[in-house]
Amino acid sequence: MKLEEKLEHNESLVGKSRPCLHDTHQANGKPIANGNPTANGKVEVYEKQEANGKGNRLGKCLNLYTWQEIQRHSQEADQWLVIDRKVYNVTDWAGKHPGGRRVLNHYAGQDATDAFRAMHLDLGMVKLYLKPLLIGELSPEEPSQEKNKNAQLVEDFRELRKTLEAMNMFSANLRFFFLHLAQILILEISAWLILHHFGSSWLVTILISFLLTVSQAQCSFLQHDLGHLSMFKKSKWNHLMHKFVMCHLKGLSADWWNYRHFQHHVKPNIYPKDPDIDVGPLFLVGDTQPIKYGKKKIKYIDYEKQHLYFYMVALPFLMPVYFNLQSMQVMYLRKYWMDIAWVSSFYIRYFITFGPFYGIFGTVLLIYLVKFIESPWIAYVTQMSHIPMKMSSEENHDWLSTQVVATCNIEQSFFNDWFTGHLNFQIEHHLFPTMPRHNYHKVAPLVKSLCAKHGLQYINKPILKAFGDIVRSLKKSASLWMNAYYE
């Protein structure tokens, strides 16, 4: 059969109901030998279904699809994705996805296997939600991932994950996290005791503002852990504690944070899927966005000086203005009543504890003074690992490559671990979001070795250089904009 005729023949079979095959494949994606061949050489695929706790196999024929067919379904109104060679139509269900609809849309038409494994705890339970969405599987002759991806790299990364699971690297040390929570609560209680004992003088106000700032920053890191389900074995306990830490202790919406942050994790530094780099028109970042703005002669502000705006705007106002207002807006527009109740308890707590000393207006000022001081801390920690790294439009690389090219690490020290909430191990965190952070340093050598094997640059830099690279990156982007704007 000629190549053209073979392609035409395969295309005519795409999406059609195929004879069925037992729901098992070899590592290379080929069907195992216990399938029953039919007249046309195809075999039947049966989906396992449990009935009354017994392993009964109910015959359910699945369609077979090529990657070419799957990639056509990549729009918000028509979303298919692949997990472990199974094809799912998530179009109508995306709005019900606990992690947000956009995360699914970002993988429409793609293999989402590694992202699925990375972002969930109990895969068996989660797959129950996927069962009604199953429409077929990859044709036996199709590779398990898109043809542009390095199959050996994908296999090596999955073997690494299995190794880490066997080493119990995904098991949390609860003592570590509860000591961290104790640190936060002790700082807050200390601030109130000092205020109660010494009064609300300027010196005392400065001191307690410092204590509350440290508490809030460390609270940011703890809520980040809980949002990623890395503390408890059960998702529900992580979610409940996340409400307490993020909403009650910080006064921000947990759901808002998760829906935003998960997008960043699955597609870091990818336009327009990563909300963390959607900072235009105030800032232009990366190499492509500045040139795009420049060629279109767009000049909302003086971009030549955007590195100065970073100091004047991004550092002090990220937490008290941008995050705070966006959190409130999303909570009320999407009617997150649970989060609204929890966040209300944050303000009630502050008015009860600090209101008698400062009054209502003074307490509000204290809240936002603390957020204002905390903001540069969080801005530096969150931006130093991403802003200087590669930014691009969707290229659909494998999970390891996607994360490594968009992130970098900061040298380890006791201070760096504490100051960054262990986000100095940003590469390991992005590869394994549900891994407890106290294990990052243990897996880093294995990740570095895998990167070296496949020619991926594993960047690890001093913290002060990382701070400086943010500004240098903004200057570089400004220069690209200038060249395109004035050419």
UniProtKB/Swiss-Prot annotation:
It comes from Mus musculus. Residues 62-139 form the Cytochrome b5 heme-binding domain. Pathway: Lipid metabolism; polyunsaturated fatty acid biosynthesis. A motif (Histidine box-1) lies at residues 224-228. It is a multi-pass membrane protein. This is Fatty acid desaturase 2-like protein FADS2B. It is found in: Endoplasmic reticulum membrane. Residues 1-175, 223-307, 371-487 are cytoplasmic. One of its GO terms (biological process) is unsaturated fatty acid biosynthetic process. The keyword Lipid metabolism applies. A motif (Histidine box-2) lies at residues 261-265. SMART domains: Cyt-b5. A motif (Histidine box-3) lies at residues 426-430. The keyword Iron-sulfur does not apply. The histidine box domains may contain the active site and/or be involved in metal ion binding.
